[in-house]
Amino acid sequence: MEVAPESTIAPGMIDVHTNGAEDVLFNRDQGSAVEVAARSYVKQGVTGFVAGIITAPWESMLHAASEICESANQLEEQGGIGARCLGIHFEGPFLNPKFRRVHRGDWVLRPTVERAREMIDACHGALVMVTLAPEVEGAEEVARFLFDQGIVCAAGHTAAKYREGMLAIGLGFRTLTHAFNAMPPLDHRDPSLLVAFMQEARTTVQLICDGYHVAPPMVDLLYRTVGTRLVLATDNMPPSGTGYRIDGGVVRSEDGTMAGSALRCDQAVRNLMSYADLPFERAIINASAAPARLLGLERDLGTIAEGKRADFAVWDEELRVVATVVGGTPVYGAVHLHQRTAGIGG
């Protein structure tokens, strides 16, 4: 394939934390949301996403997971329509009630291995990540179980401090959900678990890089500390339900609490470039290779190399996505795939 000479080919991006797309939510629209997300995400240069299920009545969470997996499998068999669903992420219900934010308190549950098994069964083997608070009762046993199953344990919606964070990493927690958000502030005398994840090379740190959830100077500081271990994640929340609105670039609940972002992955890359003074070829790593490593998919995804899956996006000279290819098949902006390329990022 050839593209315009002023264009750049870069690896397809992966969003590991998304709650839906357009006007659909995975929790509510379930299977039907997968195709909408698949077609929507490629417009941003995203070739893979993890469908997020947020805290809700337990049985409804399990049902949503099952429906999403069935729909994703059907789309995979059809092939060539858009971004691929790479698995399921349960953001809850095993959270610290004090840091639940917009997650309803009466739906928060104590983590148990039995419930973890129910998650796995509902996802038909496609559960790839679970966000839980490492300090709550039962979290240690569940974290060990999930780690043994090869499922990523993400620390989030947590009151954990530094020591608890280090213990969590020792148990198998490998990533931090939306750094700085829904956790204690960064305190120089009594640091939170964020510092543990910043220090520990085995981990990654996810960030909502919209300039609202985390101020640009803190984004710069975080990048300087963790570099390619920083994973750009949108945590986008389509404001399609009652009680939510877009305000100042973020989605808020009726009481003003941040409920998620209105962020696109391509904008997250441009923001990181601006906030941390990075060239494109470095910032794109945090939206492609870094999330691929987090999910254990770096052998097939995240970079452009011989033998890897042909997932990539074409960016124009103004760093706007103009075409996306998934598995070697053009799924967006095929008209732009006709001339020679100027360079390859990532």
Where are these regions (language model features)?
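Divalent metal-dependent hydrolysis catalytic cores, especially in the metallo-beta-lactamase
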Residues: 19, 35-64, 82-96, 123-135, ...
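Active-site core of metal-dependent hydrolases
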Residues: 27, 117, 121-240
